[in-house]
Design a protein with these regions (language model features):
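Divalent-metal (often Zn2+) His-rich catalytic cores of metallo-beta-lactamase-fold enzymes
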Residues: 27
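Short, glycine/acidic-enriched loop or turn micro-motifs at the edges of active sites
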Residues: 23-24, 164
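Substrate-binding cleft of secreted/luminal carbohydrate-active enzymes
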Residues: 12-23
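Carbohydrate-interacting/catalytic domains
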Residues: 1, 14-16, 30-33, 39-189
Length: 189
């Protein structure tokens, strides 16, 4: 999630949507009765009832694209119902609320939350992140998303590795000796 937000913070109209800043994941719904979104429920009945989509396929689709993922309770802490309510929440809480919650994220200097804070600070400090001209480098590389932003005589290099494996990349000469502004990996060398 840090890799994705790192690249997204260089988009002009970036917003943080409920739980993104904590690294909250989509909640898996295993049964149609767990959904609350009437559009999702109606689509399930309409498409599976007409035989156009198998029920298992429709559940997979709704888990990926349904709106209820964005409607689950905010995970404030590791108490019952993630600290969202002392009552019964209207929709189920994410199964990882005991570890992924605001209380834990705010206390951990290496958390997704604190990475967001650093990026937002940089975004406010460095106009190039928002207003710089975008240029994609190495569009054929399937593992790395690397691009530059240019604003006047300033240049910014953004490198995102969307794999779990370490990747080799030759940094363009213009960035030799440049300062690393932020990284979600420990610095080496």
């Amino acid at each position: 999630s840090e890799c994705l937000v790192g690249s997204e913070m260089c988009i002009r109209d970036r917003y943080v949507y409920q739980g993104d800043e904590l690294g909250m994941k989509n909640v898996p719904f295993h049964d149609l009765s767990e959904f609350r979104d009437i559009e999702s429920i109606n689509a399930f009945h309409e498409l599976t009832g007409a035989g156009k989509v198998a029920p298992d396929d429709m559940m997979r689709y709704l888990n990926l694209r349904g709106r209820d993922n964005a409607r689950t309770p905010m995970q404030w802490d590791d108490t019952a119902s993630a600290g969202f309510t002392t009552g019964t929440p209207w929709i189920k809480v994410g199964p990882d609320y005991e570890t992924v919650n605001a209380k834990n994220e705010m206390a951990d200097p290496d958390s997704v939350y604190n990475y967001y804070k650093k990026l937002i600070h940089l975004r406010k400090e460095k106009d190039i992140m928002v207003y710089g001209t975008y240029e994609l480098l190495d569009p054929e590389d399937e593992a790395l998303y690397v691009y530059t932003r240019t604003l006047g005589d300033q240049k910014l290099l953004v490198m995102c590795n969307f794999t779990k494996e370490e990747q080799e990349y030759t940094v363009p000469e213009t960035f030799a000796g440049a300062e690393v502004l932020i990284s979600n990996y420990p610095q080496s060398g």
